[in-house]
Curated annotation (Swiss-Prot):
Keywords: Acyltransferase, Amino-acid biosynthesis, Arginine biosynthesis, Autocatalytic cleavage, Cytoplasm, Multifunctional enzyme, Transferase. Pathway: Amino-acid biosynthesis; L-arginine biosynthesis; L-ornithine and N-acetyl-L-glutamate from L-glutamate and N(2)-acetyl-L-ornithine (cyclic): step 1/1; Amino-acid biosynthesis; L-arginine biosynthesis; N(2)-acetyl-L-ornithine from L-glutamate: step 1/4. The active site is at T203 (nucleophile). Its EC number is 2.3.1.35, 2.3.1.1. It is an enzyme of class 2 (transferase). The gene is argJ. Its main location: cytoplasm. This is Arginine biosynthesis bifunctional protein ArgJ. InterPro entries: Arg_biosynth_ArgJ, ArgJ-like_dom_sf, ArgJ_beta_C. The keyword Plastid does not apply. NCBIfam families: ArgJ (TIGR00120), PRK05388.1 (NF003802).
Length: 424
């Protein structure tokens, strides 16, 4: 079961003015389950996306980028595509590694939805998640589109969270609200993911919507920064997927003042609320990591750069030896120290890391310093911390002022079982 992940309360997921969501059971991979989602976006909205860095990216990712570029080019040249009007998401099939046919299938999906909704093809962003190297069952997917559009309502966020799940055990959603100049701004989001999770995006999908009025260029920069502080700070297994996507939508329907620059009133409040939502959704993916029994926070302080800190954090967080020790509730200091030591392979500036200066903490307990076990450390105290479902690991490098936090989970027997049986 997920590690301390609260169950979704549908009534708590605030509808976002200008957004409607609809789902269908298309039987793409599994019978009688939600597996197709359409999100309708009102005119005048700003939409921004961040996508996988995997060079083997899926066809829908390529088409998403193309359609976003078409919208941005239209804004400067004038044309018929005035903005993104809809998102369409299917689960059960990633449409990755499917060549020209995969691109044609992604485009055909957009064409059929465009006809149903009477909107331009280029105004639709397609997303797929599931098994790689299998072609989409287009007859099933296309048959589901009219049903999903018929189901469009403003309060479908909980069902939408369920409709994008694959190996997830639990749906993931979050909502919050801030006040700017006495006016409310709402933020609601959903995410999916449980395995093949590592930064630069992973096999995760995240969709966050707000009724704030944010210019397109500012939303683009905010989305990138928020992704770097949330979805790019998680790891379940160290694998980066072909399909990951993070989309932020600002409908502009709130009565609050427009936000056009980081210096504007309300910018920080809205940024913080978007970040809060995104970090919750990112951590929810880790809490629901395939077979996870522990949620682990790794904080690295005293680095020369954020890159140094994040590199060490992920070196610890994606180490199979560290993760299996966490599953066993084994306070194995050596495995953590070893992971710190080989982090220099990924970050050249760590080549001169003085291991005699660093300190390692489990929770608030000093467990290693001066190149070895702390003199005050007692194994039973470390064991007590490892027995907890949530574990904090802190590394103090004492070489600078930068820090970074990442979130990961343990490796259990079930992780192997889930992935060994994934295609069967």
């Amino acid at each position: 079961m997920p590690v301390n992940l609260p169950e979704i309360v549908p009534a708590s997921l605030t509808p976002i003015q200008g957004i409607r969501l609809g789902w269908a059971e298309s039987n793409i991979k599994t019978q009688n389950r939600k597996d197709l989602l359409v999100i309708e976006i009102c005119d005048g909205s700003a939409v921004s996306g961040v996508f996988t860095q995997n060079r083997f990216c899926a066809a829908p990712v390529t088409l998403c980028k193309k359609h976003l570029d078409a919208v941005k080019n239209n804004a400067t040249t004038g044309g018929n595509v005035s903005g993104i009007k809809a998102l369409v998401v299917n689960t059960g099939n990633a449409n990755a590694g499917t060549g020209e046919q995969g691109m044609l299938d992604a485009l055909t999906t957009c064409q059929h939805l465009a006809e149903i909704m009477a909107i331009p093809v280029e105004s639709i962003l397609p997303f797929s998640t599931g098994v790689i190297l299998e072609h989409l069952p287009m007859d099933k997917l296309l048959a589901g589109l009219p049903l999903a559009v018929t189901n469009l309502t403003t309060d479908n966020w909980a069902d939408a969270a369920s409709a994008i799940m694959t190996t997830d055990i639990a749906p993931k959603a979050y909502a919050t609200q801030v006040k700017v100049g006495g006016e409310s701004i709402n933020i609601t989001g959903i995410s999916k993911g449980a395995g093949m999770i590592h930064p630069n995006m992973a096999t995760m999908l995240g969709y966050v919507a707000t009724d704030a009025n944010i210019t397109q260029s500012l939303l683009d920069s905010m989305t990138k920064e928020i992704a770097d502080l949330s979805f790019n700070c998680i790891s379940v297994d160290g694998d980066t997927s072909t399909n990951d996507s993070f989309i932020v939508i600002a409908t502009g329907k709130s009565n609050a003042v427009a936000i056009t620059s980081p210096n504007d009133k309300g910018y920080q409040e809205v940024f913080d609320a978007l970040l809060e939502t995104s970090q919750y959704l990112a951590k929810a993916i880790v809490r629901d990591g395939e077979g996870a029994t522990k949620f682990i926070t790794v904080t690295v302080k005293g680095a020369l750069s954020i890159d140094e800190a994040k590199t060490i954090g992920f070196s610890i967080g994606k180490s199979p030896l560290v993760k299996t020790a966490m599953f066993a509730s084994d306070p194995n200091l050596g495995r953590v120290l070893a992971a710190i030591g080989y982090a220099s392979r990924e970050c050249d500036s760590l080549a001169d890391l003085d291991t005699n200066q660093l300190e390692l903490y489990f929770g608030g307990l000093l467990v290693a310093e001066k190149g070895g076990r702390a003199a005050s450390y007692k194994e039973d105290e470390g064991q007590a911390i490892m027995n907890e479902a949530e574990i904090d690991i802190t590394v103090q490098l004492h070489r600078g002022n930068e820090e970074s936090t990442i979130w990961t989970c343990d490796f259990s027997y079930d992780y192997v079982k889930i992935n060994a049986e994934y295609r069967t």
